[in-house]
């Protein structure tokens, strides 16, 4: 099975993770937290939400849904990328090899 490593757990990162895991790809999201979404008081007109939702609540629900489908989240900071025979995301917690 191929695997993908996504850097960042904002809406784009979690959306990418959802599509990847639904396609049968082992998916890991690297997150350091403290993104703009965590500081947003109110998000309006977001797809799937009839009423405004706080940034932290939207983030919590999105990550919960992704975890339910099998996405792995790792709390760390990406600090570099290397490419030899395979892509590797270097983080403060170690290296994460990936196919994409």
For every predicted segment, state its role.
Residues 2, 91-100:
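Core beta-strand elements of the Rossmann-like FAD/NAD(P) dinucleotide-binding domain
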Residues 70, 78-79, 98:
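Mid-chain, well-packed structural core segment of small domains
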Residues 62, 77-79, 93:
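Short glycine-rich, polar/acidic loop-and-turn segments at beta strand-coil junctions
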Residues 37-38, 81-83, 97:
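Short active-site-adjacent helix-start/loop capping segments
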Residues 42, 69, 85-87, 94:
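A generic structural signal for short beta-strands and their flanking turns/coil linkers
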Residues 2-69:
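Beta1-alpha1 glycine-rich phosphate/pyrophosphate-binding loop at the start
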Residues 74-87:
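A conserved short coil-to-beta-strand element within the FAD-binding core of flavoproteins
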């Amino acid at each position: 099975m191929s695997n993908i490593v996504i850097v960042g757990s904002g809406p784009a990162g979690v959306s990418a993770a959802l599509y990847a895991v639904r396609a049968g790809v082992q998916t890991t999201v690297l997150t350091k937290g403290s993104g703009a979404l965590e500081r947003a008081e109110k998000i309006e007109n977001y797809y799937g939400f009839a009423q405004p939702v706080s940034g932290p609540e939207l983030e919590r629900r999105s990550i919960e849904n992704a975890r339910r489908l099998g996405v792995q989240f790792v709390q760390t900071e990406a600090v570099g990328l290397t490419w030899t025979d395979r892509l590797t995301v270097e983080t403060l917690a170690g290296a994460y090899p990936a196919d994409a």
